[in-house]
Amino acid sequence: HVRALNLHTVGLGGDSEIKIEEQVLSVGPKRIAPVSWLGEKMDAHKAIDFLERHIDDYSSSSEPAQLFSATSFGNGSEAGHSDSELALTDQEHHIIDLLRERPYSLLELGWKMGMGHWMMVPVHKLEERHLLQRSGLTPTDLLHHRGQLDLWDAETAEHYIRLLSRRAKYGMEELTKRVFEIIEERVATELLRKQLVHGDDLSTKGKCGLCGEMVKNILCRGNESLTLSVRFHYPV
């Protein structure tokens, strides 16, 4: 017999995308580059300054505030493909030319290219071909803000977190606290699901209000009426 680990992945990590949609926070499963990493590579403050000046132009979603930069492929140093092989449109070439200068947000790209809405900016093919890199708010940036991590540029992370907190009408500490609560609840829920569901059938992923309240009770060590606890039969 071959010994193996019985694994179940959750899709949460330091590079998980943190999004704000209508003041509702979500974490993952998409992965993006942390803005602290971007700030270590190049100056992103002009892009964030633009977002601050146009803060009323993206009221319902944080996606247009995500930042884009040209990769080494997009800069041409390692492309290995001719323009004809890449078959980029004039608009896509324009995006790459802009990003070779400095990072831009999706909102500013739309404004710079004279498009009516940021959703019209054609970045998806460029992402798929690794010609540009998407950056945004991640748990790594929040750890830089807390002083618990010192890998990259904490100043850029602070600048960006302050912007998104203002846009979402959260305080910086409130936003940070809520994100880590979401991560904690997700990890705890998946740990319990893995132990409770036999075999590989983990398809019961619908939201359950009672289940969520039970997880919160366990993590918060109870409330005035009830205290729940969990004991695993082996290490996890």
Question: Which residue stretches match the model-derived regions?
Answer:
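N-terminally biased helix-coil "hinge/interface" segments that flank
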Residues: 1-236
